[in-house]
């Protein structure tokens, strides 16, 4: 198992949790983004810069990830594609997407896109709360413990 991060929009606090977990466990952690992302100096932590462009980082994660890996992303279509590959997907708020929940998430996303396209202001997501940060860290620990890392 290794961890892939859709790092273009990943909150700094989530990256810090991931850096600590990778340092503690030795698991391979790769942050994928279309710009340089600084990472701690460690053999198991790296940053991968891809070309700028729509979904280029997402496509790289789909290409490189394997069944059993963990991807950190809030991107619902990316999560749906990864779940089909049997890759686990955890969003930065601590929600683990599953086959059972991803279809509903896609429907909500599509509905919100339709509302925005019709001119209705929907706003963006709220900043991460302390509870969500804690839930992310706890869920990550559960996943790593289950994988015995």
Curated annotation (Swiss-Prot):
Pfam families per record: DUF188 (PF02639)
CDD domains: PIN_YqxD-like (cd18720)
Domain of life from the UniProt record: Bacteria
PANTHER family recorded: UPF0178 PROTEIN YAII
Similarity field: Belongs to the UPF0178 family.
Name listed for the protein in its UniProt record: UPF0178 protein VF_0601
Source species: Aliivibrio fischeri (strain ATCC 700601 / ES114) (Vibrio fischeri)
């Amino acid at each position: 198992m290794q961890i892939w991060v859709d790092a273009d929009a990943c909150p700094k606090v989530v990256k810090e949790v991931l850096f600590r977990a990778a340092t503690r466990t030795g698991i391979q952690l790769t942050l994928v983004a279309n710009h340089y992302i600084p990472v701690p100096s460690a053999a198991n932590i790296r940053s991968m810069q891809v070309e700028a462009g729509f979904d280029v980082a997402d496509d790289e994660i789909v290409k490189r990830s394997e069944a059993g890996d963990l991807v950190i992303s809030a991107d619902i279509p990316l999560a749906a594609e990864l779940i089909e590959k049997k890759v686990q997907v955890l969003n930065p708020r601590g929600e683990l997407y599953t086959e059972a929940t991803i279809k509903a998430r896609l429907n909500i996303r599509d509905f919100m896109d339709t509302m925005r396209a019709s001119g209705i202001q929907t706003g963006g997501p709220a900043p991460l709360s302390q509870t969500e940060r804690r839930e992310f860290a706890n869920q990550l620990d559960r996943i790593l413990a289950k994988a015995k890392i």
